[in-house]
């Protein structure tokens, strides 16, 4: 029987078995499916997802080799430390390795020499997400975290909550949680936390990656338009999210952001699982713990108007409180009491490249952050402003808009508003190559007036930031790429000032 979920209301009861929180810590666990060892050769192995998959495959006992167009540290170093042989480029001669299976990353397209050889010879191949679903996730209790923003942070929180509760989860995350020091690991636990990406699976499978994961617990963190290179509009992404909803069993649970109209539209298309909302009255909420205590330092967790825990931590921002609520609600589904989960967040150390301090020189602190979508840029600046407190402390925002969506210019009009709370803005657009912008960054930043400047020369950008920075300033570098090592360049330049 199909259940349609109305806006901001709990699902109507149905004549099926209701999802229940797992007993904690003892309960019957599903047995993981076993697979015989094989040799897999991974195309596009140095990507975040495929590199993590390679580590999991190696830990599962498979022989793993791989290739990529850019074999360089830190991913190459991490993979080689796992005993994984890496090959530079996609030469067709790699079919002579004679693996049992080729695993294809979504960076690979038709025309790739090795892929063409695989197709011409009729050799077996599969996408990375499908291989993961069939060989790692099958038989496990999968906790998948989806959403436009906060996937990496929320996945890291959730993995930590299960770890601190003694559940020893496996995980695959699109960043490096500082509590673990690795982005992926395989354990004998029945629980597996995965960052569930909506980007497409492969050139031959245009569904979102997450349809392969079959979660029992699904977190829908938020939903905005993104990935303009593959999605024409928000409705197309909503369709993919509904595909994910369709894979959650009736005894599963969906934890969703009750503030998101887009996610409410997704659920209104049909939902067959129990739904819990966070961020709204009647669901999970983060409220002041007591009068006079900043909510960024300590907040109370409420579930259905009942106070169930308290979080004291060093992670700033309303967006991170929402991430925390999602993680606590998801952890409860596998049996972690909310009070225990809330207490565990005191030891959560966040994720590399999420407001990560790269160094401090001459009173100037340089941060690294992965923000590249206008919403993420705005919330990241707001989070740093909350951390440093005083308006006398300046934020110098250094931005490289290099995501596929940004390069297309779809969101350039939103940049000024997202950067408005920074004191100075330094934008960088590569003049040539794959990261070159197809639009004028200076014109896009013009509404910010004299406080914003655009550069197409990294050396000149570093020089300008160094000249502008003064003791007490905070330089916030935002990019979803390496940004030419600008963080260290800035620290070196600041250190050489006389």
Task: Show where each model-derived region lies.
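Intrinsic, low-complexity polybasic segments
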Residues: 7-17
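ATP-dependent carboxylate-amine ligase
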Residues: 24-75, 80-85, 98, 102, ...
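Short coil/loop residues immediately preceding or within conserved phosphate-binding loops
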Residues: 37, 140-142, 296
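Phosphate-binding loop of NTP-binding sites
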Residues: 56-60, 80, 94, 106, ...
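A short glycine-threonine-serine/GTX helix/turn-capping micro-motif
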Residues: 207-208, 310-318
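Acidic-glycine-rich active-site phosphate/pyrophosphate-binding loop
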Residues: 288-308
């Amino acid at each position: 029987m199909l259940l349609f979920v109305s806006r901001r209301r709990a699902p109507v009861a149905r004549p099926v078995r209701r999802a229940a929180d797992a007993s904690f810590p003892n309960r019957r666990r599903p047995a993981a499916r076993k697979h015989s060892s094989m040799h897999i050769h991974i195309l596009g192995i140095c990507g975040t997802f495929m590199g993590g998959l390679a580590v999991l495959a190696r830990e599962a006992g498979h022989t793993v080799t791989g290739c990529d167009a850019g074999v360089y540290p830190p991913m190459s170093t991490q993979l080689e430390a796992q005993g994984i042989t890496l090959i530079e480029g996609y030469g067709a001669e790699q079919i002579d390795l004679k693996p049992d299976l080729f695993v294809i990353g979504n960076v690979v397209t038709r025309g790739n020499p090795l892929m063409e050889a695989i197709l011409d010879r009729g050799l077996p191949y599969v996408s990375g997400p499908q291989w993961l679903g069939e060989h790692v996730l099958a038989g496990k209790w999968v906790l998948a975290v989806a959403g436009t923003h906060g996937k990496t942070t929320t996945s890291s929180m959730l993995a930590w909550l299960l770890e601190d509760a003694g559940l020893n989860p496996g995980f695959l995350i699109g960043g490096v949680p500082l509590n673990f020091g690795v982005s992926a690991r395989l354990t004998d636990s029945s629980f597996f936390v995965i960052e569930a990406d909506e980007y497409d699976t492969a050139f031959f499978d245009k569904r979102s990656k997450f349809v392969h994961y079959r979660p029992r617990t699904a977190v829908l963190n938020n939903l905005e338009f993104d990935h303009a290179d593959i999605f024409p509009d928000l409705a197309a992404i909503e369709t993919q999210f509904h595909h994910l909803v369709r894979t959650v069993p009736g005894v599963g649970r969906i934890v969703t952001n009750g503030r998101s109209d887009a996610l409410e539209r997704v659920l209104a298309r049909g939902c067959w699982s129990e739904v819990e909302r966070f961020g709204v009255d009647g669901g999970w909420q983060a409220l002041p713990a007591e009068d006079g205590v900043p909510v960024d330092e300590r907040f109370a967790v409420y579930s259905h108007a009942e106070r169930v825990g308290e979080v004291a931590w060093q992670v700033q921002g309303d967006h991170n409180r929402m991430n925390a609520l999602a993680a606590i609600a998801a952890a409860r589904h596998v049996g972690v009491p909310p009070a225990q989960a809330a207490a565990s967040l005191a030891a959560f150390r966040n994720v590399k490249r999420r407001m990560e301090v790269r160094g401090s020189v001459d009173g100037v602190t340089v941060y690294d952050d992965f923000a590249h979508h206008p919403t993420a840029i705005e919330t990241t600046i707001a989070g740093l402003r909350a951390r440093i407190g005083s308006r006398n402390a300046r934020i110098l925002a250094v931005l490289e808009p290099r995501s596929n969506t940004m390069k297309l210019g779809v969101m350039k009009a939103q940049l000024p508003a997202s950067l408005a709370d920074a004191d100075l803005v330094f934008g960088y657009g590569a003049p040539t190559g794959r990261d070159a912008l197809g639009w004028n960054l200076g014109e896009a930043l013009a509404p910010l007036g004299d406080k914003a400047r655009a550069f197409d020369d990294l050396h000149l950008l570093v020089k300008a930031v160094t000249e502008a920075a003064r003791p007490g300033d905070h330089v916030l570098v935002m990019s979803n790429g390496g940004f030419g090592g600008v963080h260290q360049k800035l620290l070196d330049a600041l250190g050489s000032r006389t």
